[in-house]
Design a protein with these regions (language model features):
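Alpha-helical solenoid repeat scaffolds of the TPR/TPR-like class and their adjacent stem/linker regions
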Residues: 1-172
Length: 174
């Protein structure tokens, strides 16, 4: 009855990035008796959101300043059962790590809602609204169709600061 070691890899666990509003719901509600959740951060950690998310998890590592080989080795040392990529084919992705099989089960979700094109990426989480029946053959991953909707949103906690527009102080429009 060992816990499943699940890690989320992302460059976007920072203040007010949209994926954090979706991931937070998962981190607040996972079954702590069945899962050990970790973050693999590919970004700065000195912000409110990364600190909060780390406190909701059982562990975290940062690979931002590591090259691919050192990142692969550091991740493999953790013996994760499942790693979920939250970036997909975005500018800060680390898909090359997944090409080197950093976990027995590798999946993508949330950050880029399309195929990664990486043969070693086993699964993508989606719903029938996200991936249509006639698009299934375009995915290199096995598609896990979730019932209902493929994501959840934790709500916004942004406090808006009222201030005059810059042109009032500057006396010109930009």
């Amino acid at each position: 009855n060992k816990k499943i070691k699940l890690a989320f890899l992302s460059s976007d666990i920072n203040n007010y990035h949209s994926i954090t509003y979706f991931l937070k719901t998962v981190l607040l509600n996972y079954d702590k008796n069945k899962f050990e959740i970790s973050l693999i951060l590919n970004s700065e950690e000195d912000n409110y959101t990364s600190k909060e998310f780390k406190s909701l998890c059982d562990g975290s590592i940062n690979i931002k300043d590591l090259n691919d080989i050192d990142s692969i080795n550091k991740i493999r040392q953790k013996n994760y059962d499942i790693i979920v990529d939250l970036m997909g084919v975005s500018s800060s992705n680390r898909l090359v790590l997944f090409k080197n099989r950093i976990a027995p089960i590798q999946a993508t979700w949330l950050g880029y809602c399309n195929t990664t094109g990486v043969d070693q990426m086993d699964y993508i989480f989606a719903d029938k609204n996200l991936i249509m029946d006639d698009e299934v053959n375009l995915y290199s991953e096995k598609i896990i169709f979730l019932s209902g909707i493929w994501n959840t949103h934790s709500g916004l906690e942004i406090e808006r600061v009222k201030q005059d527009p810059p042109f009032i102080k500057n006396n010109y429009l930009t």
